[in-house]
Amino acid sequence: MTNNLSGYRNKIVRVKTSKKRPISSSNWLRRQLNDPYVAKARLEGFRSRAAYKLLEIHYKFRLFTPNMKIVDLGAAPGGWSQVASKLIKASDNNLNNKIISIDLLEIEPIVGVEFLQKDFFEKDTEELIIHNLEGKADIVMSDMASNTIGHKATDHMRTLLLCEQAFEFALKVLKPSCHFIAKIFRGGAETALLNKVKREFRTVKHFKPVSSRSESTEIYLVALNKK
């Protein structure tokens, strides 16, 4: 599991624009076909290129160790849960290693991962996660993002709201000295949230993985050592 992209950048795939296909769809398809991380994910068995973002976060901050309990919010299609499963050496028989993953969309089974197909915002979802976790969590991670509409300010605020909800949940379930990871889009309104996070965690960092597309405003909030 490395970020060596040798051999993934050599071939450019061109996409003809169909009369029936919107230009935006053609651009998305072209970007996917020519993205070295998409190709690398297919070859290495990861379900999405997002897997490499979490790997980079781990290699930078060394968050994951065996015998952890983890909550993955917005898990589909499962790339982050796959990475976490490998890093904590999860198995279906080891109750000390546990990953609870949640999303509205279904994901295929992953070793050591218990998946809940639920809306995180439903009233009973938090209680269900806490019940299934059987104790406090070591890491809460959220790659949740709202469906983008191309309006940066709106996309920023919608994803920031998801991050705030994930943060409030993390405060309830994390053990002391444990960690929270979440995606945000830069846009200026995140300062108030960052101040809240800094009051609850000893170290708070911004991190943009190399595997995050350069044109994207996404960054990751890495909050270490809950007080």
From Swiss-Prot:
Signal peptide: none annotated. It is found in: Cytoplasm. Its main location: cytoplasm. GO terms for cellular component: cytoplasm. It catalyses: uridine(2552) in 23S rRNA + S-adenosyl-L-methionine = 2'-O-methyluridine(2552) in 23S rRNA + S-adenosyl-L-homocysteine + H(+). It comes from the Bacteria. S-adenosyl-L-methionine binds at residues 78, 80, 103, 119, 143. The active site is at residue 183. One of its GO terms (molecular function) is rRNA (uridine-2'-O-)-methyltransferase activity. Keywords: Cytoplasm, Methyltransferase, rRNA processing, S-adenosyl-L-methionine, Transferase. Its EC number is 2.1.1.166. It holds the Pfam family FtsJ. HAMAP family: RNA_methyltr_E. PANTHER family: RIBOSOMAL RNA METHYLTRANSFERASE, RRNA METHYLTRANSFERASE 2, MITOCHONDRIAL. Belongs to the class I-like SAM-binding methyltransferase superfamily. RNA methyltransferase RlmE family. Specifically methylates the uridine in position 2552 of 23S rRNA at the 2'-O position of the ribose in the fully assembled 50S ribosomal subunit. This is Ribosomal RNA large subunit methyltransferase E. It comes from Rickettsia prowazekii (strain Madrid E).
